[in-house]
Amino acid sequence: MIDQNIQSSSPLSASEIKMIEDTKLSVLERHHLRVLAHCLACFKDMANGLNEGSLPNQENRLKWCLAQPSLSKDQSFIPVLLDQFAGAARQLETVANELGISPLELTLRDLIQKVTLQN
């Protein structure tokens, strides 16, 4: 069952969260997949919903973070989040390159397929 507090603050839909939970991946692998999917959804939001092209650059990531009401309460978290976005971006760009698509074209299904093929 999906915690309502998590769902209301997540950029992932309930069906996307369920899709991740329904995989036969370990708890750690599902967590990693959720983090990547969460970052991908944030990147798409930063790109104003574009579904193709490169991931937003560091400057656009910072602007997006500063515009988030939930981050305005704890701006000391923004550098940590930007570091996490940078790490996720590297991983997402690698997956996109392997699939021959742009990073913003990635979908949750692509990420699930990549993780399950590694196991």
Which role does the model predict for each range below?
Residues 2-40, 59-84:
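Short Lys/Arg-rich basic patches
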Residues 20-53, 85-105:
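Surface-exposed, Lys/Arg-rich phosphate-binding patches that contact polyanionic backbones
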Residues 51-73, 103-119:
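Short, basic amphipathic alpha-helical segments that act as recognition/interaction helices
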